[in-house]
Structures are given as structure tokens and as C-alpha cells.
Amino acid sequence: MINLKDKLILVTGSGTGVGSGIATTLAKCGADVVVHYNNSEREAEETKEIINSLGQKCKLIKSNLKVVNECRRTVDAAAAFLGGLDALVNNAGITIPKDIKDIDENHFNDIFSLNFRSYFFCAQQAVKHLIKRGEKLSGNYKNYNWPGCSIVNISSVHGKLGHPGHSVYASTKGAINSFTKQLSVELIPKHIRVNAIAPGTIEVPSYFEKDPSYNREFGDSLVPWGRVGLPEEVGYLAAYLASDLSEFMPGEIIHIDGGLTSAMNLNTDTNKTA
């Protein structure tokens, strides 16, 4: 088990789905976690109950991260509750597939403001707290005998692979990948690691809403490994990147997709649509 004992972590968009899986897995590894959500209050409460049952501290913060000041407020409130911040996991996001001819300015701005702009401004605000944490734990955040703090951005295979109807969503993920590289270079001197996780298809409730049997079969058929991924699998990778084990690993974009971006599955029926 990865050791996150005494780690203080904020996970945005963690009331449900992949974010909830990340938050609960971090808690299993010993971290205290702030769960951010906007609409999924019932699911967020359930996530909090799981974290508390594991013996870890947890606070729920409701906010609309499409608003820049709410990004700042959320990060500050998380750090205040936890008593500092060791890691930020940027996970908040939405996808609304649309053909390019049907995309208007409101649709574009709605997705970009949450999927990318919130990552930027949450990270910007978190840096202040991560530096303070480094000074508290090591006496100097530039102390290279100290493993440092971490920012983990949740991207997607769509940052690398094209898919019909995802021109805006995929563009946000490409932006996240570029931002991760740039911010990593900028923050290395401050002893803050920045990495991204790019999941493929992950088993979450929304994925099976329309037709559980068809979607599961279709999703599994796309993946060379033969199945879709699980939220906790993304969670354990996030835990590794938030842990001291990843000290010498800044600026990486790690795909966790069952081989989707590495191989063409010749058994996939390309006439099917998700």
C-alpha cells in the first residue's frame, strides 16, 4: 500500500465518479482529503462517509469552479480545514459531445471554464499553500532532502486521440497536457511536482446510464486489455504521484487506458457508436 500518512490533499470534482474513486483511494492510503463538488451533494456525502469510516479527516466544499474567485476560495478553504496542503488533484470537468457545426460560444466557454481554466487557477492558488507546507516541513521549500509537494491534473486519452463530437472536450485535455509540462518546469525550483493522468474509459455510473449492457460491451471491446478501467485504478496512480515515491518524477503525462493509446484493437467494430 502506498503511504500517504499525514498527507493533506484537495481533490476537485470528487463527489462522484472518477473523482470519488480518487478521493477514497487517497484516504485508504492514509491521507486526509477535502472533497469538492458542485451538484452531486448526495454522492459527495457518501464519499465523505467512506473517507471518515477509514479513519481520515474529510470536509465537503461546494463551489462552482467555472468562477475564478470560487477556485481561490475552494483552495483556501481546503487548506484552512486541513492545516495546509501537500497535494492538489485537479479533476473537475464535464463533457457534452456535440458536432462542431452545433457548438456555440456558450457551449465552448462552459466546457473550457471548468475543464481547463479551473485547473489553472486552482493550481495557481494551491502553489502558495504548497510552498508554505514545504517551509513548515523542511524549513526551506528548496531543501532537496525533502520530497516536495504535488499537483496532479486529470487529463484524458482524448488529449491524444480524436473522437467525433469531442472537439471542445479534447481541446481542454490537450491544454491540460501542455499546462502540465509548462507548470512542471516552472515549479521544479519550488520543489513542487506537476504530473497528469490520462485515463481511458473508466467504469462510472454515468457511463452506463443509457444502456448498461450495450455500453459495457462496447467499452470493453475498445480496450486491448479487454475491459474498461476502475476509478480506484486511477486513484492508486494519483496516490503514487501524491506520495514521496514520485519525488524524482515531474512533468509526466501518464496514460492509464488498458493499452488503448498503444495499440489498435482490430476486433473493434468501427460502425458502432458509444
Predicted regions and their residues:
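Residue(s) in the substrate-gating loop at a strand-loop-helix junction
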Residues: 156
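Short C-terminal tail/terminal secondary-structure segment
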Residues: 3, 161, 250-274
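Active-site loop immediately N-terminal to the catalytic Tyr-X3-Lys motif
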Residues: 101, 147, 161-167, 189, ...
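Active-site helix of classical SDR
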Residues: 123, 172, 180
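Substrate-binding pocket helix/loop in short-chain dehydrogenase/reductase
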Residues: 99-100, 104-112, 219
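Alpha-helical segment proximal to the catalytic Tyr-Lys
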Residues: 128, 185-189, 247
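Conserved glycine-rich cofactor-binding loop
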Residues: 15-17
